[in-house]
Regions:
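The Walker A (P-loop) glycine that initiates the GxxxxGKT/S ATP-binding motif of P-loop NTPases
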Residues: 91, 124, 343, 371, ...
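Conserved helicase motor core of P-loop NTPases
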Residues: 453-615, 626
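C-terminal accessory regions
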Residues: 610, 619-739
Length: 739
């Protein structure tokens, strides 16, 4: 690619826009007699710098010709005029316009040499003390040290974004680490994968040792499989992938694994006589969960005995009647403080949780509510009447520049200030988040875990809810009685039929909430979905096409996948207009007014809400794209009641959300759901995916397909295998606390 890039050399004359979070900037550069707009990741650029940019010319729809830089080489200003502009920019602490003028007038083109090598001479200038001179010199050296590192990374072949990410994590050690072993970046810097590290290594004058490459390769295979939900992998299962990736033989692959273990890049654990490999941080999280759970069992909170009469009083006050299992759940939660509460729709989980909250608070206990996503937390708040927070917000997420995982203000050293935590939608919580939550619980804190064991496992690694239930160490109350009011809903009754492997009953009568719109053609199905969302459902039920109706697709691809359905619905609900700005990215268009979804956690995006501000948007958040500001390359998205502001470089983190995959819908509830089942890929045609989709609908569910496609999903109770070790670690013999 480097051969295709053009060079542009010039002096920075002005900075139009800068995003401190990701380094993106818009600057004005003077090259000869011409002024050029340069855009890209331009870290710590200052007025007066002379820079060689590498990139390509682009045409901005509003602002014309621009140079998009992907690499740059910086040189220090060589003349007095350039030095003055640089110092006057304010980048060096203690030097403003007036001081910069005094320094350059005295030392001329020798200014930088004096600051760097003879800082005591700065004290010859009135207003600069010896101590201030030392501070100026120190800050000056730090500024150019960063520039030297960025230049060095560019010379090795990294683009500006990669160099920024590397420097954010490794700081002044960046070049030393990369030159010694570029493969170390695969585990240290989230944006550098094995293929990219391999490319850099192959172009280095002195390639790193072969064993460094092999260790990184086998570690990468284990890390990559986190995205498939595995916390660990059988050792023998990565031999062939390693041989293909590294182009090595079996013995070399085995040696690479052993070396990675010796280097603490992997951890090996014997589980039922079979060797499994973990990333160290996942091993620590999963084994740590087990140890914390064991401690909670061994040292329970002081009992807060509850009498049947108190539960009776709650029933009378709220005009409800608990069944036997609900009463059992309340007693365990209040008295013992450790409980898993499961149940499908209509079984009274929410009512039970309300009872637990009230009876705990009646005993003076401070109760915190949490859920894995913003949508799930909002729903929990609405159902319980008590504020629920995302787990990240409850723990006060902190995210350091370039880090691949967040840290939290609340942890073992700084626990939460509460007596009980109730966490909903536990089936969505992965091992790293659950481990962080347990670490933040104070001693003797009650923990009530609520979820539906029949829903999909989390997108992240692990299977926490299923593994905790399987361990049989924690009290589990499974609510299975469908209450009379809920039984009126065909959505609820059919969801329970599906769980039991029975076909749903299709009742297409006017007063039903569960319909099958029969269709055998995937092409016709796409058109019918659009008609349902844009016309039939809004006119028949009064639901808003964007706010209330959600299309859930098993797959992203195909005629009835999210990509095609989103394009069709966008064209109908939010067509192009001269009054609406838009941006194109990888073949699709985002337009002002579009329904969009955040597809990865980003802890740096700033947001504003009724005078309050903060940072962080999360995977699965749904909002409306309210503004595309091409002048400053900024986009705004309104998520519920907060407005987030993105650099246009982060457009890759949002996508259209008129339709979403069933996996992305976890933890959400929509007034109306449209679910295509026709042409579902066999690997996605299974029962708990179908069940999860059904249980996302509150008032209306319309399936577009046929009985055969539904039956294929109901009959397939095979779950994709997830390797995890929580049950193993929870066994008595494998937890250090009990040894």
């Amino acid at each position: 690619m480097a051969d295709e890039l053009e060079n542009l050399t010039g002096v920075v004359e002005g900075i139009t826009y800068r995003n401190e979070a990701n380094g993106y900037a818009v600057i004005e550069v003077k090259t000869g007699d011409e002024f050029v707009t340069v855009v890209g990741v331009l870290c710590d650029i200052t007025v007066g710098e002379q820079i060689v940019f590498q990139g390509e010319w682009t045409m901005h729809p509003n602002f014309g010709r621009q140079f998009k830089s992907v690499r740059l080489t910086r040189s220090r200003p060589a003349d007095a005029s350039g030095m003055h502009r640089f110092l006057a920019s304010g980048i060096i602490k203690g030097i403003g316009e007036a001081t910069a003028t005094k320094i350059v007038e005295k030392f001329g083109s020798n200014t930088f040499n004096v600051i760097e090598n003879e800082p005591e001479r700065l004290a010859e200038i009135k207003g600069i003390s010896k101590s201030k001179a030392k501070r100026i010199s120190k800050d000056f050296k730090m500024q150019f040290a960063a520039r030297d590192v960025m230049n060095g990374l560019a010379e090795l072949g990294f683009n500006q974004q990669e160099a920024y990410d590397i420097y954010s994590v490794l700081k002044s050690d960046s070049l030393d680490i990369v030159n010694e072993n570029p493969y170390a970046l695969v585990s240290l810097v989230g944006s550098i994968d094995f293929a990219r590290a391999d490319e850099i290594a192959m172009n280095m004058q002195q390639a790193p040792p072969f064993d460094c490459r092999c260790q990184a390769g086998v570690t990468y295979i284990v890390r990559h499989n986190l995205f498939n939900g595995h916390t660990c992998l059988p050792r023998n299962s990565i031999i062939k992938p390693a041989m293909l990736l590294l182009e090595c033989n079996e013995d070399e692959a085995e040696i690479a694994i052993d070396n990675a273990i010796d280097a603490k890049q992997l951890v090996e654990e014997n589980i039922d006589g079979k060797a499994f490999l973990f990333l160290p941080e996942i091993y620590e999280a999963e084994s740590g969960i087990a140890e914390r759970i064991k401690v909670m069992i061994e040292y329970p909170p002081a009992p807060k005995e509850i009498s049947p009469a108190e539960i009776d009083a709650f029933e009378k006050t709220n005009n409800i009647t608990f069944d036997e299992k609900q009463r059992e759940a309340i007693e365990i939660a209040v008295n013992k403080g450790l409980l898993i509460l499961t149940g499908g729709p209509g079984t009274g989980k929410t009512t039970t949780v309300k009872g637990i909250i009230t009876l705990m608070e009646n005993r003076g206990l401070d109760v915190a509510l949490a859920a894995p996503t913003g949508r799930a937390a909002k729903r929990m708040t609405e159902l319980t009447g008590k504020e629920a927070k995302t787990i990240h917000r409850l723990l006060e997420v902190e995210y350091k520049d370039g880090a691949t995982e967040p840290s939290f203000a609340h942890n073992l050293k700084n626990p939460l200030e509460c007596d009980a935590v109730i966490v909903d939608e536990l089936s969505m919580v992965d091992v790293t988040v659950f481990s962080a939550l347990l670490d933040a619980l104070p001693l003797s804190c009650r923990l009530i875990m609520v979820g539906d064991k029949n829903q999909l496992p989390p997108v992240g690694a692990g299977n926490v809810l299923a593994d905790l239930i399987k361990s049989e160490l924690i009290g589990v109350v499974s609510l299975d009685k469908i209450f009379r009011q809920a039984m009126k809903s065909k959505i609820v009754s059919n969801a329970h039929r599906v769980v039991n492997g029975e076909m749903p009953v299709f009742d297409n009568s006017v007063d039903s909430d569960f319909f099958l719109l029969r269709e055998n053609s995937k092409y016709n199905a796409a058109g019918k979905i659009v008609n349902l969302v844009t016309d039939r459902i809004p006119s028949g039920y009064g639901f808003d096409s964007v706010r209330d109706i959600q299309v859930l697709c098993p797959s992203r691809k195909g005629e009835v996948g999210t990509e095609n359905i989103n394009a069709l619905l966008q064209a109908k609900l939010n067509p192009p207009s001269y009054e609406k700005n838009e941006i194109k990215y990888k073949g699709y268009t985002l337009r002002e007014g579009d329904k969009v979804m955040q597809i990865k956690n980003n802890y740096d995006v700033p947001w504003f809400k009724d005078g309050e501000n903060g940072t962080g948007v999360f995977n699965g958040d749904i909002g409306i794209l309210t503004r595309i500001d091409r002048a400053n390359d900024i986009i705004n998205v309104r998520f519920d009641d907060k407005e987030a502001m993105y650099s246009i470089e982060n457009v890759k983190e949002i996508e259209l959300a008129y339709a979403m995959t069933v996996h992305k819908s976890q933890g959400s509830e929509f007034a109306a759901v449209v679910l295509p089942t026709i042409a579902t890929p066999p690997k996605l045609s299974y029962r708990n995916l179908f069940y999860t989709a059904l249980t996302r609908a509150r008032n209306l569910l319309i399936i577009v397909g046929n009985e055969a496609s539904v039956k294929a999903m109901v009959d397939n109770d095979k779950k994709s295998r997830r390797y995890s070790a929580l049950v193993h670690f929870l066994s008595v013999d494998n937890v250090a606390f009990f040894k």
